Amino acid sequence: MCKMYKVVETDASPGQRSVLQLVKDLLILSRFHKYNPWLAVFSGGVSLPILIGNSHPLTSGVSVWATLLAGANQIATHPASISADHIVKQTLLCLICGYIFCGAGMVWNDWIDRNIDKNVARTKNRPLAAGRVTATEGFIWMMVHVAAMIPVTISTILYPFGKRQLCRRLYIYPQYFLGFSLAWPGAIGWMAIKGRQIPFTQSISESLPLSITVFTWTLYLNTAYSYQDVVDDSKMNVNSAYVAAGSRIHMFLVILAGLVLGSLYLQLRAQNSGWLWASWMCVWALSFVHQLLRFDAKKPESGGPLHKENFALGVWTIVACAAELGLSSGMADQFFSNRVFRR
């Protein structure tokens, strides 16, 4: 058991390979060839000190939704205190950091689970499980692009261990750690915009509904996606929410979708935006109904398309939040009043 977690690889090294092939496998290990890392861009990620304005350090939380929503709220209530350009720059920094952080989390998950992944049909060809990248190379690669704040780092490290039996006895599932990793930066993204104007406790309370939305949404989409592995994971007695749900998996997903929409209602009520009610709440509600009607507990592979559809929801929500910023700041009016649109 201990050999599984050794940093130094004791197995035979991969055969001869080019540097280009190694680089390709490392990028695959981080899932940079897929859409998965963009999920962290939508709702969670890391924090880092950056210099803004008059060289004041500010912590930029990787939460694009939170940053855009907080920016729209701030510019609507105190237009002289902040500019739309500043909000956009903060959002771009959040996007970049979240993307890199998620890559590190993907590597860590595969590094811990490499011996399990060898026995699961969907994951046996991943670089670490297939032996194309050694454990040492994978660990070093992860350290290269780890730049995370402490709470999220700890949660990300604990995520793969949540699949072990100790956590089962404590009724702790790995989806909880993943949900926290993506939800906590919602507060950081909020403070990246409003942290100087309001107390810390107020930032937490204002961003809490969004963080809960992201937490429950992550539980929903990860449970549906991971359900594809339920047959192999059940044989190995892997601890996970979808294994525990068993035959009641469909009802479990319905409950999670309801919790997502309930917490989203609280967030949008505070935003008081007709545009967000239409573009966010209505779109998500219709999408969830469509997803849950398509999901079939007897066909685990039906969980895969749900994950992709939620990725599309995340992209759309960035567009919706960016449009809200444009509407709140008056940028939309300026854009459409440009002479290009005049006859």
Curated annotation (Swiss-Prot):
Give the pathway listed in the UniProt entry for this protein.
Answer: Secondary metabolite biosynthesis; terpenoid biosynthesis
According to its UniProt record, which reaction does this protein catalyse?
Answer: triacetate lactone + (2E,6E,10E)-geranylgeranyl diphosphate = (2E,6E,10E)-geranylgeranyl-triacetate lactone + diphosphate
Provide the alphabetized UniProt keywords.
Membrane, Transferase, Transmembrane, Transmembrane helix
Enzyme type, top EC level: transferase
Major localization class: membrane
Localization per record = Membrane
Q: Which GO terms describe its molecular function?
A: transferase activity; transferase activity, transferring alkyl or aryl (other than methyl) groups
Q: Per the UniProt record, which residue ranges are transmembrane? A: 38-58, 62-82, 92-112, 138-158, 170-190, 241-261, 273-293, 311-331
> What is the documented disruption phenotype for this protein?
Accumulates triacetic acid lactone (TAL).
This protein's cofactor list reads: Mg(2+)
Task: Tell me which Gene3D superfamilies the record gives.
Answer: UbiA prenyltransferase
One biological process term from GO is:
terpenoid biosynthetic process
Which InterPro entries would you find in this protein's record?
Prenyltransferase, UbiA_prenyltransferase, UbiA_prenylTrfase_CS, UbiA_sf
Q: Name the membrane topology term.
A: Multi-pass membrane protein
What Gene Ontology cellular-component terms does the record carry? plasma membrane
Q: What is its EC number?
A: 2.5.1.-
**What does this gene product do?**
Polyprenyl transferase; part of the gene cluster that mediates the biosynthesis of meroterpenoids called sartorypyrones. Within the pathway, spyF catalyzes the prenylation of triacetic acid lactone (TAL) to produce geranylgeranyl-triacetate lactone. The biosynthesis of sartorypyrones begins with the production of triacetic acid lactone (TAL) by the NR-PKS spyA using one molecule of acetyl-CoA and two molecules of malonyl-CoA.
PANTHER family cross-referenced by the UniProt entry: 4-HYDROXYBENZOATE POLYPRENYLTRANSFERASE, MITOCHONDRIAL, PRENYLTRANSFERASES
Similarity-based family: Belongs to the UbiA prenyltransferase family.
- Can you name this protein? Polyprenyl transferase spyF
Q: Which species?
A: Aspergillus fumigatus (strain ATCC MYA-4609 / CBS 101355 / FGSC A1100 / Af293) (Neosartorya fumigata)
Organism phylogeny: Eukaryota, Fungi, Dikarya, Ascomycota, Pezizomycotina
Q: Gene encoding this polypeptide?
A: spyF
